[in-house]
Structure formats: C-alpha cells, structure tokens
Amino acid sequence: MVENMETSFKSIDLIQIMDKWQRKWDESKIFETKHDNREKFFISAAFPYLNGVLHAGHLRTFTIPETIARYQRMKNKNVLWTFGFHVTGTPILGLANQIKEKKEDIIWAYTNLHNIPMDELLKLDTPEAIVECFSKKATDAFKKMGFSLDWRRNFKTDDKVFSKFIEWQFYKLKDLGLIKKGSHPVRYCPKCENPVEDHDLLHGEESTTVEYNLIKFTSTFDEKDVIIPMATLRPETVFGVTNAWVNPDEIYVLAEVYDEIQKLDSEDVDLKYNGLWIVGKECADKLKEQDKNIKILKEFKGSELIGLKIKNPVTNLKVPIFPAEFVEMNIGTGCVMSVPAHAPYDYVALRDLEKVEEVGLISLIEIEGYGKYPAKEIVEKMNIKNQKDEALLEEATSKIYKDEFHKGKLNENCPEYKGTSVKDIKEKLIKDYMNFGISEIMYEFSEPKVVCRCGEKCIIKTVKGQWFITYSDENWKRLAHECIDSMEFAPENLRHEFHNKIDWMKDKACARRKGLGTKLPFDTNWMIESLSDSTIYMAYYTIARFINAGINENQLTSELFEYVFSGNGNLAEISNVSEVSIEIIEEMRKEFLYFYPLDWRCSAKDLIPNHLSFMIFNHVALFKKEHWPRGIEINGYVTIEGKKLSKSKGPVLPVLEVSETFGADVARFYITTCAELPQDADVKFKEMEKARDNLIKLYELAVLVTKEGIIEKELSIIDKWLLHKTHSSINFAEKAYEEFHLRKIGLMFYELINDLRWYKRRGGDNNGVLKEVVEIWTKLLSPVTPHLCEEIWELLGHNGFISKEIFPNVKIEYINEELELGEEFIRFTMEDIRNIKNVAKINPEKMYLYTADDWKYELLEFMNKNSEKNVKELIPIVMKEERFKRHGKDVMKLINDLMKVGVKKAIAEVEILENAKTFIEKEFECNVIIGGEDFNGKKKFAIPYKPAIYME
C-alpha cells in the first residue's frame, strides 16, 4: 500500500497550494489577536531595515520565531506575533543619493542582486520612494512565506505616531538622568557629516572604538623641547622600554598642540596649550578630530629621528630611537615603544639590528613557566629566525600576551606596583598616568577598514554638544545583569556573553544631525539614531492596533504613554487632553499588561553587542521588573553554497525568489532544520530539492490513505511499532519546539520517512494506522510547513484550519519501548547477516541464529540497574556476584562488548526472531532456524542484542 511513496507526484504544485492557503488565511484573519482569558505568548524578531529586499539571512532569523509562534498557538496560547519596519538613520538617505547619481556598483547590486527592474530602481531617488518600495516588498515577502502575523500592528519607524512613542521614551530616560550632553568620541562619516552606527556601514560593521594610552616621552628636537607620544594598550609595559621605533621612510610632523576645552552649556571651546608634539602625519589628522587643535610647524621624514634620545616619563631612563619599517602609520602615533623582554617582535627586530646588547633587556613581569625574559625564550624555542617569520611571531606574541594577562605579576622593576597581576593593573595605571600628566587618550578603530555606506572612510571624531546614553552607569548595569540572570537564553551559553557585553558597555551617542526617524524632543536640532529608537518598540506592538485604527500623532501625548506603560497619571485628564476616549486608553493598558513582558526576542548573533544589549538596558530603566524581557534566542549566520551573504556583492537570495522557486514550505523547512541555532546555516539548493521530495512523500501517503479507505483490522506487531514510534515523536517534537531545537524536527521527519520504508518492508499495510500516522505528523509539521499541512488536513476530510488545531497528545497505550528495541534488534541482526554474507561470499540455504545464554541477559539486567557506573566501577561489583564470577574473563569481555553496543533493556529475543522469521527468510531467500544444533560452537559468541550466526 505504501509502495508508491518511493516515487514523487510531479503533478503536486506546492506554489499553488501555498497561494491557496495564504489567501484563505488572509480572508479569515485568523492570526489577528487581542487580550482574552487564555495564557498569552509574545514573541518578536528584530525588525528588518528597509534598504533592500529581505534575503536568506532574514529568512532564517524570522522563520524561527514564526515557527515557534505557530507551535504555541497549537498549545492553545494567545500568540502575539507581528512586525514593524526600520527606516531610521542615514543609510536610506545615502542610497537615494547614490541612485540619483547612478552609481554603477549600486545600480548593478540592486538590479542584479535585489531584482529591482531598472525603470523601477531609477525612481527610488528619494528616501520616501525607497521606504515605500521596500516596505511593500518586505510585506509581500512575509506573506509569501506564510508568516502568521497580525498585520494590524505593523508600523515604520518614521511614522509620526511611532515618533511620539520614542519621544516618551527619551523624555523618560532624560528624567532618569540616563541621557547627557557633552563631548563624545563616535564613529563618524566626514562626507555625511554624521555619526554612524553598525547599520550605516559598508565595511567594519563589528568595529569598536579602542582606547589607546598616549605615553608622553620627551626629548629635544630642532633645539626645542618636544613631546613624542607613544600609543599602547598595555600601560604596564612602559616600565620595560629599552628603545623606540619609527618608520624612517614615512612623514612625521612637528606641531603645536592645543587641547580644546568645551565651555559650559555651549559648543564653543577654549584652547589650552599642550606642547610641541612629534607624531606621524596621519596621526595629526586624527588628533584634529579628537579634541586637539593642531598647528603643523614642520614636516619631515622619520629618518631625522633616528638616534635621538628620548626620556621615559615613568622610569626617567633615556632610550634611543631606532628605525623599523614594520611601524604602521595608520595605528597610533607612528612612534612605538620597544619592550624586547616581553614582546617577540621587538626582541627579533633588535636582534636583526644587532642592538640587543647595546640597549639590554628589562624584565617587568613574572610568569609561571617562563624565565626572566619571556620574549627571548619563546623566540629561541620556536626557532624564529628574523622579522620575516611573521606567522611565528604572531603566534609567539599571542601566547605570551595571553599568559602574561592571565598569570603574570609585575616584578621589582615596577616598584609601586610590584606583585599586582597584569589583568588587574591597567585601569589603575591609566588613572595614575593621567593624574601625573604623562598620558592622554587617543581613539582608534578595532578594524583597519571602516567605511560608510556612502563609500567614505570613517573616522573617530569627538563630537561636541553630542547627546549620549550613559550605558556606562554602574547602577544601570547592575539592573541589566539582574535581568540577564532572570532570563532564558537559546542557546543557554549566551548568558555569559551578555554579561560580558554589559560589563564592557560604554556611553553611546544617541543622536545625529540628519537622517530619517524621530527628532530628539528636548533638542530638535538632533535626530535619534537607529540603535536608540529600536530598543523597546516591542511594547509599542501591544498597542499599535489601537493607534493604527485612527489615533493621530497629536493625540499621543507622553502622559498617555506613561499611563499605558507605567500606570501613572490621571486617566480623565489624559483622555481630555488627548481626545482619546477613556475606554480606548483602558483597552490599550489592558492589552499591554496582558501581553507584556516579551517572552522571546529573536535575532542573529550580530545584534548581541548593540541592539539586544540596549534592549535589556532600556527595559530595566523604563519598565517594572515584571515587564522585563524573559528570553532571547540567537541564531547563526547564513551562507549560500558556502559563500557569505553580501547585499552589495552577492549572493543575496531574496526571500521572494526562494518562495517562488521552491515554495514557502520547502524554504521554511530547510532554513529551520539545516543547522542548530548557534551554527551558521549553509543553503544548498540540491539539499532543498531533497527536502521538497521528502515533504511530498507525506502528501502522497495522505492521498493513498484517502483513496483506499479504512478497513478495520487487528493491529500487528509492526502496526504497534509504527504507532509507538509516531506517538513517541509527539513528546520529542514538543520538547524540540519548546527549546528552539528545530533541526531535531527535520531529523525526526526524515526518521519518519525511514520508518515508513521499514514498515512497508515488514509487511505493514494497515490503512487505519497509516491515517493516524499522517494526521499526527501533519500536526507536528504544521508550524514548519503550514501550507502543505493545511492541504493534507483538508484532504483527510477535516474542516477548519490545522493552524488552529491543538497539538497532538500522546496515547500512552501505544508507547512500548520493547517494540522499538525489538525492531532495532531485527534491523541490526539483518545488517550482521548481510555483512557475514558479503565477507564469506556465500548464498546460504540455511541460517542458524543463536541467542545468548541466560547468564548474559542476567548480566545485562544487572548493568541496567547500575547504569550510572563506568566499566572500572562496574567490574568489581559484578565479580562479587557468584553467578557471574564463575564465568571468569568472559564476564569482563562481555561488559566491554555490551558497553560498545549500548546497555539496553533485555528483550525476548527468541520470540522476536520467531515472529520475524518469515520476514528474514524472505529477505535472504533461505531457511532460518532459531536456535537448534550448535554448529562449530557458535552459540557461545552470542551476546544480548547480537545473535551468533551460522550459515550453510
């Protein structure tokens, strides 16, 4: 009856099925929701940015919560699942300008990768046109994928009504003292004249701002007293400086340096003289943007500095400057401290110059496992010959720095700090150096290439009069840590990473001079930037349907939001001023209180250090503890046939293209089951085709079941086995959905396909059983492949939507582990028979199967009762039993053998083999005898679950 499952129904049109059920869902509005008496479930994903089409990365990140939302509905929960669209900031402005200028790379990317026809693309020369175009395409993509969203709650972040919500948020943060104004170093685009965030960048999205210490060495140059600052991330190493390095072929400058001191309550500055500095020309350009006024007096090559003696401000030692071509001018000042006792690069460079004896080595850190001069020691141990051995030098440096940080302590050459561990000294030294006036701060990017979407290279700029959110506030961090401790994480190991991100969080610029979005309500010259207006919008989802039904921005006062989200204020007065009825405001508050807190927030891992961490910060500041988020799910990235996604270079794989090519269900099934959460998912089109073929098999079985009808008959062993396997799957599937282990759903489905093949081989042909299997699996798969499952559900004669059905319950009477072990035993026995046949190269006429002696089953039972013991612990206990002891060495061998095959429950092997005798005979075309005469003493080799086999 299931033979036809091995062929595909080529006539099945998954696209047609997809369109049919999307239309029915849309007409019935079954995914619209409001507060009621059921248990609620609120899940959301980071909304997409509308500067392109939704792609494969979006597909994975969004399909995971979509699947969980459908599952939770089947658990009879009231599910809130919806989407907004992010348009804040400058990327859309930049894209409009690039299209207007007909930039070749942009035109190519959007016509070839985003599939925008040329005539349509050239019309997208305004931000408004781009937002309209891509919001429609995103909506179409969500609908084409069958997302079960409540569309009444959709919004864009430049909607005037949403801006009023953000104004409330920022007024409240300011009232709490969490927004301040001052000078602040930010990533900055000189062309856009704006701070830039991760979403604004073409390259360097994960770059951070790194704080370097400039140690102010002094000397005399051109008969003038000069400061030669040297950048370091390790201020303790100043104690071990023996010389300095400059690049002889690069350009340096002698410049008057003035500190820019911002006047109180003003963006104007006073200038304070800071001396004559010698730095690289590129460094001077950077310092101009970081609170320094630079007046260049002279440009010269680094070779003029060679041999100059400079004074170490910490040790007062005078050390020479040597030439080094390895000095990079794009990082730091172009002048580098040399610490050869602890830096392999410095030691090898000095050795190449034959200067080691001249300057000597100064030890400053004691490390367990190393001698006095770790760099010299590791260079000699790794046989590093010269500076060209870059890979080895990098490895040596990494190892020493790691060991010094974790295990090192400062020695007697650091008098006041002797005995302090390296990992604990940095902040104290920075503070001390600053107090002594011998150190300053300079900022660099953590990555060499940071480029704005407009194509301009970004810089770090100290913006004056900048508004920033004080994420460095220790009390605020304490609340954020408390929230993280109370949350669930999928996967769980993310908890530690979030704690780390909170610890390292610094103040963040929250506004810029231009862009789309919301004006800063208390300083309208500034626009709130994109990572600051996207932290609590999940709360807005809860009330968006009321606002979208006809409330305008003038009615949305901060007092109204304060009442809805905090319960503060006089309701009658708020209603009177806003002209929103008391009834509506009360409904808004009820809806918020019902659906909040957010149960799960879903995103890809790139948002951990920014959006997701900011979400936690803002929730703990603005909402009561009972409304803090409960869970965060993070997935890995997506590649296409091994290639990294790129909006500008490709591949992209638009979501609409996937749905039109494979159908939504195939795409949904594949993208959610091809990899575990933290792993990156690689989309392989051949595998998607295989997934499609296997899904069609379930439909084929449903067709065959309905065609042939149901004939009542007694359940056979193999019928009971299939029912056991199917009902066992219910618990496994439930656990997988609850824990976001969606890959397991796919593996279970593929196991079902194999189970059905085995059922057929074993002679299974009970239509009633097969129908029950199809019905259960249609429900189990419905959250992942809803269109196909709706079609099968209808085919099986059911009314209504499977999307609104209750998740199946396990029928305990069908659960029988012995049946599963029995079929597994038969399958493995047949594999052993096949292997023996192949090795011996015979086709037997008779085959004898010998099961194990009774004492071996007794030992198996004994091992089951002591399953927590390992082999070493088990053997002494077993040998105390006389019934086992008399079998001597055979016992120890059997214990090891049973451990290898897996310690399982003892089963009635003789009875199972007798029941399967006809099946085995048919498979191998020979007579099978269970037991019988012991030929060649074979029986003694039988162990539980592994019969001995004799063929003739």
UniProtKB/Swiss-Prot annotation:
GO terms for biological process: leucyl-tRNA aminoacylation. Its main location: cytoplasm. Keywords: Aminoacyl-tRNA synthetase, ATP-binding, Cytoplasm, Ligase, Nucleotide-binding, Protein biosynthesis. It catalyses: tRNA(Leu) + L-leucine + ATP = L-leucyl-tRNA(Leu) + AMP + diphosphate. The keyword NAD does not apply. A motif ('KMSKS' region) lies at residues 644-648. It is an enzyme of class 6 (ligase). GO terms for molecular function: aminoacyl-tRNA deacylase activity; ATP binding; leucine-tRNA ligase activity. A motif ('HIGH' region) lies at residues 48-58. ATP binds at K647. Its EC number is 6.1.1.4. It is found in: Cytoplasm. GO terms for cellular component: cytoplasm. Belongs to the class-I aminoacyl-tRNA synthetase family. This is Leucine--tRNA ligase. The gene is leuS.
